[in-house]
């Protein structure tokens, strides 16, 4: 959801609470539980999962490896669930032409730098940069070049925008901020 007027433009950024992250977290959790149960059932010699008889899987080496994969999968899925619950990467970009200020806010991981807040003047913005990398895995990212701070990304690196969409976004931002567009 975005909100735009003549003087203020607020763009909300979705963080890690995306459908794909929910799907990956569920798949990893269920798969790792399955691996762990198969490894434990091979150790106990009893069927905890009816799909695999425990006599077919030896504890050494298959059962140990299955337990290891199950535990590793649980760690990775718990990491994904934590990033989803903390909504890491979400926030907003606020461009205020009236005040001449740009504010970029993002939620990070818990700790000292949980809230990432950048604030700078519009007159410090040199240009909107469009980095395009074509090939097998194309990547198109928009950056805002700021005097003294370098490039700040405006679009996510995992957003798969078409060339037309990225050009339109760059043109809208450049028009609103009254800065040139650079392509790299």
Swiss-Prot record:
PANTHER family found in the cross-reference section: PHOTOSYSTEM I ASSEMBLY PROTEIN YCF4 (PTHR33288:SF4), PTHR33288
Family that this chain belongs to: Belongs to the Ycf4 family.
Source organism: Illicium oligandrum (Star anise)
Membrane-topology annotation of the record: Multi-pass membrane protein
Membrane-spanning intervals of the chain: 22-42, 57-77
InterPro entries named in the record: PSI_Ycf4_assembly (IPR003359)
Protein name: Photosystem I assembly protein Ycf4
UniProt-listed GO biological process terms: photosynthesis
Gene name of the encoded protein: ycf4
Keyword Ribonucleoprotein: no
GO cellular component: chloroplast thylakoid membrane; photosystem I
């Amino acid at each position: 959801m975005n909100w735009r007027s003549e003087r203020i433009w607020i763009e909300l950024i979705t963080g890690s609470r995306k459908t794909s992250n929910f799907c990956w977290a569920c798949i990893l959790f269920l798969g790792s539980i399955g691996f762990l149960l198969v490894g434990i059932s091979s150790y106990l010699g009893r069927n905890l999962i009816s799909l695999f008889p425990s006599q077919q899987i030896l504890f050494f080496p298959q059962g140990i490896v299955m337990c290891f994969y199950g535990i590793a999968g649980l760690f990775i899925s718990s990491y994904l669930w934590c990033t989803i619950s903390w909504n890491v990467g979400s926030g907003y970009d606020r461009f205020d032409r009236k005040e001449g200020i740009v504010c970029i806010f993002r939620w990070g991981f818990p700790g000292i730098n949980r809230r990432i807040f950048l604030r700078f003047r519009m007159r410090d913005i040199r240009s909107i940069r469009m980095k395009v990398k074509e090939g097998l895995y194309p990547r198109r990212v928009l950056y805002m070049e700021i005097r003294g701070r370098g490039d700040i990304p405006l679009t996510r690196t995992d957003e798969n925008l078409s060339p037309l969409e990225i050009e339109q976004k760059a043109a809208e931002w450049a028009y609103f901020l009254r800065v040139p567009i650079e392509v790299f």
